[in-house]
Amino acid sequence: MEVTAEDLGKRSFCEAVMRARLPKAVFKELKKTIDYGAPLDAAIADSVAIAMREWAKELGATHYTHWFHPLTNLTAEKHDSFMDPVGDGTFITEFTGKELIKAEPDGSSFPSGGIRETCAARGYTVWDCTSPAFVKEIPDGCKVLCIPTIFISYTGESLDHKTPLLRSMDAVNKQALRILKLFGKTPAKVTASVGPEQEYFLIDKDKFNQRLDLKLTGRTLFGAPAPKGQELDDQYFGVIKDKVSHFMRELNKDLWEYGIPAKTQHNEVAPSQHEIAPIYGTTNVATDQNQLLMETLKKVAERNGFACLLHEKPFAGVNGSGKHNNWSITTDDGINLLEPGKTPHENVQFLLVLTCILKAVAVSYTHLTLPTT
């Protein structure tokens, strides 16, 4: 299974693809929206939708979906075909800017945190143009153009995890720009970035199928300790078994095709535990990619005779699976605000930014930072 240069990012409607397929004026206006939140004209949206549809069709896509993150901690999608009836018994393929920007899925069966009744069905998905669309292939099924979106109620309340994330990124941007003005600096934007490491367990499928608790809950609920655990620290960074290495190779190929910058892979501390880590990216994009990564982990594991466990503590007595987040904030002209420099104790800008973050954590998580009696 060879990975060629043409495979890298081929299923992602990334900036390079947009630049190549969109008229220059359209690409320029879309970039203003992506980078600085400028309003998106309907004509621009129509042009983007046409280019996105043609690109997806070339990859074999027959359907599209507004892909979002409801409060289930999973992703959600409803597939609509590109086919529209003309009226004389024939069909045309169509995908408009209106369909790209907004859809109205039934929100009554999604959790809402108690903010509305079940009969309040209407929900809206709205395109997050800052996160690249991608084409997902369903084994033995259709190929689907997935458009990252937010999910809100008719009255504007957030019904997903992504809307608060985007709002928090906007708040960080505004306050960071305010602080930087005190130092005489005037960048146009400050962006939060994150590189989430993903730990997971691979269990042989025949062993997995013998455990009803693993099948139903993704973790063991009872059982004896393993004959050999992690006492010798010989699993961590150890030689990767051939079967696992084959799985990782197939996983990387799929991730690279999606444009996910998977970089590092290794054995973790516990037996049968492993890790994959991508290069950091803009926070909402990295979050979308992590959801897609977890879905891909499970699918590739299935194809290779494994079950992939993503539960944070699937086995007692050995390490659980964390998701370390390498987080930072950076200006649009390339300055990392959490870079301490050679003399951090004299770097007033770094100290102020760090103090603001510590203060925010202290205020938000008082129960974790203050002693209890």
What are these regions (language model features)?
Residues 198, 268-276, 321-323:
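Short, conserved phosphate-binding/catalytic loop or strand-edge motifs used
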Residues 149, 232-235, 273-283, 327:
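Short, hydrophobic beta-strand segments
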Residues 228-258, 289-308:
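Substrate-binding cleft of carbohydrate-active enzyme catalytic domains
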Residues 317, 321-335:
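Flexible glycine/proline-rich, aromatic-decorated loop/lid segments
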